[in-house]
């Protein structure tokens, strides 16, 4: 096995130099982040990719635990931040025991992964082909490399460092938090919660997607969660005679920032109407158990403003609580 250390160092330095122009590095192993105030953040790396390359990266990362939870917009930011690195056959890309924070996706070529145990000879444990990846633990942990990776053939890789990965997650988290806080401010039943509680709820909202024609909530069913529309639209229908579909009529149509089902945080009443997705719809949801864990029972919170509490508590069960209530 050839050990072309100088080439390996130059390639690694190329990746780190391009990323470090955009990210302030702290001491090794520390997580760097931008201030959460209004100061503009330093731009992330933005390296255009061909459609074919983007598709290969998408396929490579779709089943990777470090990326599978990201939404499409977040993955696209990751793709743009990845830097091209070239290695010759025989080059050592990663050396077991070394520190490193680079994650790689193979665009072309083959790599071999070796592990030495108890000071013994290196053992080939895996072959990684085009579309494969390695080094993902370096994105979040500062621990030494667990294996050695050697290029069997000339390889073309796309690399991402841990600081960039964490920065992307931080930027997206802050962006979502601000958006969700704005949504929550419009929910009448939550209007009187304080800033800390609103931030906690914004962080607790879970994304959920629905396809065209999919029923999100059904009239008469029990419910324990409420929804805010992030993207797309839904139609709200109600049966004048519950169970008689012929009496169903449209109550309203809801759009991004509208919400429905908020009374589920307060009572166990059956759903008063049916909500159906029109086209693809992206929502965020919050259930009563998660709400109570973060903020305590909502009835106690509403008692801060008895007028609001009585308004929701005394609402007739037949009154749909699924229409938007923008302030």
UniProtKB/Swiss-Prot annotation:
Any one annotated GO CC term: cytosol
Record PTM Phosphoserine, positions in chain: 32
Deletion consequences: AcaA and pkaR double mutant shows no abolition of the ability to sporulate.
The keyword Ion transport belongs to this UniProt entry's keyword annotation: no
Key words, A-Z: cAMP, cAMP-binding, Nucleotide-binding, Phosphoprotein, Repeat
Residues that, per the record, bind 3',5'-cyclic AMP 1: 66-188
Biological process annotations from GO: adenylate cyclase-activating G protein-coupled receptor signaling pathway; c-di-GMP signaling; culmination involved in sorocarp development; positive regulation of gene expression; regulation of adenylate cyclase-activating G protein-coupled receptor signaling pathway; regulation of gene expression; regulation of protein kinase A signaling; regulation of sorocarp development
Pfam families the record matches: cNMP_binding
Positions of short motif Pseudophosphorylation motif: 27-31
Record remark: domains: Lacks the N-terminal domain required for the association of regulatory subunits into dimers in other eukaryotes.
Known partners and oligomeric status: In Dictyostelium the holoenzyme is a dimer composed of a regulatory (R) and a catalytic (C) subunit. In the presence of cAMP it dissociates into the active C subunit and an R monomer. In other eukaryotes the holoenzyme is a tetramer composed of 2 regulatory (R) and 2 catalytic (C) subunits. In the presence of cAMP it dissociates into active monomeric C subunits and an R dimer.
More about this protein: In D.discoideum each R subunit carries only 1 high-affinity cAMP binding site (2 in other eukaryotes).
Family listed: Belongs to the cAMP-dependent kinase regulatory chain family.
Protein name: cAMP-dependent protein kinase regulatory subunit
Organism classification: Eukaryota, Amoebozoa, Evosea, Eumycetozoa, Dictyostelia
